[in-house]
Amino acid sequence: MINTLWLFMFLIAIFSSLLQFLFNNDVEVFSLIVGAIFKNAQVAVEISLGLIGILSFWLGILKIIEETGIAQKISKKLSPLFKIIMKDVPENSPAISTIVLNMSANFLGLDNAATPVGLKAMEQLQTYNTKKDEASDAQILFMILNASSITFIPITILMYRAQMGALRPTDVFIPILIATSVSTLVGFLSVAIKQRINLKNKILLKWILGFVLFILLTSIGFLAVDYEKRLQISSIIGNLILILLIGIVMLTAIKQKVKAYELFIDGAKEGFNIAIKIIPYLVSMLVAIGVLRASGFLDIIINAIKYLGNSLNINVSFVDALPTAIIKPFSGSGARAMMIETMQTFGADSFPAFCSSVIQGSTETTFYVLTVYFGAINISKTRYALKYALFSDLAGIFAAIFVSYMFYSN
């Protein structure tokens, strides 16, 4: 599927640019497309090189975690669950603890920690993959959970809203939590049905119900806190947990009497190799995305939706937030820029700005995640991964729009 989509992204961009030229007399569109090719190819390399430092740091920390026995303890504790959802992964596999650490980092909104840990998890899952150029069921499930990962602390979005002058920047916290939970549940359940995972299993049901209960209690608890304290609490929790994790790893290394520094260096060396590996995959995808954006195709889609909504007498207030939704699967920075632009255009306390913020927090850069995660282990055949990841993204977008109408207040 990804091969066909990649080809069509270029063909659609060319067709769209011709329409812009013929009907809008846009003579600049062709130079914009060519400029996007060169710019995004350079950006892809810059992103990869920029990952080297953070990849090296977290892979070094992971090496210490593996050698101190922390990973084994986590794996042993969660093996009963993973035996159900990832049948090909052996009991007590180190991949289990790495997956848990990755999901925890995503959960706390710690993107810089989540990516390197996620890449390590994909490498570990690759050791159990019998078809090395094709994604396994376990890798697809992990990728979907990453692409739809629940965001418990959307600290960057709250900070942007505060900087743009929103009266109550944390108003989007609960809507984001609900929308991103819907995205995660839809992503997991759809893949579980595809992979014929037994959803009636008591252990799995307990985890799903526990997840729903946790989200519910968190929402209630957060609503009970004053507006002024919410942003501060969100920031403290995320950063404190990260610092405590590093502290626990170092203290355990002292207790176990392992050579932590040497282990860190060994693990950190892998960061450079992984960053270089993903360059061609990133170039291919980011150039295609850049060409599509420069062609004006996204504007055509937005205007068509607005026209259809008005024709059917539907409230189309959400349409002004759709640029964020359309761009987010392709580019995190692009979607963030769209969110900020929406705040500037309509006001930080407007409905489009509110909805745009919720969409930004409840969806993921699906194409980036898929490209980087599978590219790091040289997998070109992603099977049904993209289709199901986009499906969970779509569920997150619909949920974000729905809860925005529910929670928005002037």
Q: Where do the protein language model's features map onto the residues?
A:
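C-terminal transmembrane helix pair
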Residues: A113-A114, A121-R161, A166-R196, L322-N410
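Hydrophobic alpha-helical segments, principally membrane-spanning helices and signal/leader peptides
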Residues: G35-F38, V45, P94-I96, K131-E134, ...
